[in-house]
Amino acid sequence: ITFTWTTNKDITTQTLTGCTLADETVRTATYDTDISSDKTFTLSVSDGENSASSSVSYKFMNNVFWGSAAAADVYDSAFVDALSNKKLTNSVKGTYSFNVADGEYGFWAVPSNMTISTVWIGGFEVTVESVGTISYLNSKGYTRDYNLYKTGQSGLGSISAEIK
């Protein structure tokens, strides 16, 4: 994350959460540590008499993955990555549109702090089965437990599934 700022007067000190600033003339900084939880950064400046600060917060979110696939003997990170859709979110609730091909099932992989209890397709409640929890490793080396669910029926065709 790169930060850039300006001041309307000369300052004598400044600090920015998690960043080393060479001196009071610097007006840009980079935070190059991976973020795996919500984080707030605060820039504090002083001219020797008066102080001011400003903060910005980043909300850490995980992906929800969904798509069509054949049932597998082993569910792992590669299986989840092969699902055709993903979105960053802090809630699994919403509408998921995709095609469930013949011989395949609809799958959702959701962070372990989320669960799927009800799925509606075409106005009808449908059964989804939990196929377990996997330890998902993303391309950045971040590991998170994910719950994996699949539709009870295969070959549903083009669907718009609502998770409530």
Residue spans of the language-model regions?
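Short S/T/G- and acidic-enriched coil/turn segments that sit immediately N-terminal to beta-strands
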Residues: T25-A29
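Aromatic/hydrophobic beta-strand junction motif of beta-rich domains
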Residues: F3-T7, F107-P111
